[in-house]
Curated annotation (Swiss-Prot):
Cofactor(s) in the UniProt record: heme b
Role: Component of the ubiquinol-cytochrome c reductase complex (complex III or cytochrome b-c1 complex) that is part of the mitochondrial respiratory chain. The b-c1 complex mediates electron transfer from ubiquinol to cytochrome c. Contributes to the generation of a proton gradient across the mitochondrial membrane that is then used for ATP synthesis.
Major localization class: mitochondrion
Record protein name field: Cytochrome b
Any further remark recorded for this protein: Heme 1 (or BL or b562) is low-potential and absorbs at about 562 nm, and heme 2 (or BH or b566) is high-potential and absorbs at about 566 nm.
SUPFAM superfamilies per the UniProt record, alphabetical: a domain/subunit of cytochrome bc1 complex (Ubiquinol-cytochrome c reductase), Transmembrane di-heme cytochromes
Family statement: Belongs to the cytochrome b family.
Length: 381
């Protein structure tokens, strides 16, 4: 008798994606972050759903409805902080996932990579509109400052901003529509995730050696289901330590003050996972230039498959590019730090140097290093 999971039209899809999927036998723990992102997305949708049952998207009651969730709803505080810190875990996993893709040359699976970039942008949009919902000071001013950047677009900018706001300032209409966006976007993300997996399973996974693994594959279950389960347990452990002991460590104290359009916070800054892009935005004195740099800081990822000229797959046997890669990671951490600092000397100067370095490393240094390594290979063989 044939096994049902191999013949049933619905179970067959699940079977071919998560059970009998041929997987390279040597993929390391850096490959766990894809499944961890899936777990994060499910957790965010579930906690978000329960929060939405008690939240009201009205400027008069939004802040107090979040307070009500934390004080009066059974385990509301837990759901709220799991959702807030779950977003941080989501981005940590995403940064590592992208970093692993760059290190091991996974960007050569270009369809999967490009869908990944779209996923990254959609997740950033979801997190941004979500941050506005508690209607604290940083929510309000963050929304005002970031949406106002669109006014830099020539000719249609001002009209576009007022259209997004639903008026002449961030107000009731803005909050209501941001709640609607925040509710729908995770489902759009889920659809993109399925497309991401579809393209991945067309080509098969990359692996740490960068070699073809067609001749040496093992079934996904039980080997990688167990491995992923360990990753999930570690993720949940770190998340719950953050939620139960340090729930506000990644938040902003200003967001515990209700939104007040008449009082501007001393330092307006977004959540920590946007700080690198925010630092790049601030490092350019021109408004339109800053907005373009902000967008390019993410879209530049799409250049990786085009700029790759190396004869080897991944950086595992490429010491020069490897060194540049780790300088790039350090530079990204510097940008994140600068994004949270006030706009004054020496932070502005450091931010400008780090911003130029960010683009230079990707567009100039890495391709040059690849060419040098190719020449070294020719000398040896």
């Amino acid at each position: 008798m044939t096994i049902m999971r191999k013949t049933h039209p619905l179970f067959k899809i699940i079977n071919n994606s998560f059970i009998d999927l041929p997987t390279p036998c040597n993929i390391s723990s850096w490959w766990n972050f894809g499944s961890l992102l899936g777990v994060c997305x499910v957790m965010q949708i579930l906690t978000g759903l329960f929060l939405a049952m008690h939240y009201t998207s009205d400027t008069a009651t939004a802040f107090s409805s979040v307070t009500h969730i934390c004080r009066d709803v059974n385990y509301g505080w837990l759901i709220r902080y799991m959702h807030a810190n779950g977003a941080s875990m989501f981005f940590i996993c995403m940064f590592i996932h992208v970093g692993r893709g760059i290190y091991y040359g996974s960007y050569m699976l270009s369809e999967t990579w490009n869908i990944g970039i779209i996923l990254f942008l959609t997740t950033m949009a979801t997190a941004f509109v979500g941050y506005v919902l508690p209607w604290g000071q940083m929510s309000f001013w963050g929304a005002t400052v970031i949406t106002n950047l669109l006014s830099a677009i020539p000719y249609i900018g001002t009209t576009l901003v007022e259209w997004i706001w639903g008026g002449f300032s961030v107000d009731k209409a803005t909050l209501t529509r941001f709640f609607a966006f925040h509710f729908i976007l995770p489902f759009i993300i889920t659809a993109f995730v399925l497309v991401h997996l579809l393209f991945l399973h067309e080509t098969g996974s990359n692996n740490p050696s960068g070699l073809n693994s067609e001749s040496d594959k093992i079934p996904f279950h039980p080997y990688y289901t167990i491995k992923d389960l360990l990753g999930v347990l570690l993720l949940l452990m770190v998340l719950m330590i953050x939620v139960l002991f340090f729930p506000d460590v990644l938040g902003d104290p200003d967001n515990y003050t209700p939104a007040n359009p008449l009082n501007t916070p001393a330092h307006i800054k977004p959540e920590w996972y946007f700080l690198f892009a925010y630092a790049i935005l601030r490092s350019i004195p021109n408004k339109l230039g800053g907005v373009l740099a902000l967008i390019l800081s993410i879209l530049i990822l799409a250049l990786f498959p085009l700029l790759n000229s190396s004869k080897q797959h991944g950086l595992i046997y490429r010491p020069i590019t490897q060194t540049i890669y780790w300088i790039f990671i350090a530079n990204l951490l510097i940008l994140t730090w600068i994004g949270g600092q006030p706009v004054e000397y020496p932070f502005t100067m450091i931010g400008q140097i780090a911003s130029v370095s960010y683009f230079s490393i990707i567009v100039i240094l890495m391709p040059i290093a690849s060419m040098i390594e190719n020449d070294i290979l020719k000398l040896h063989y």
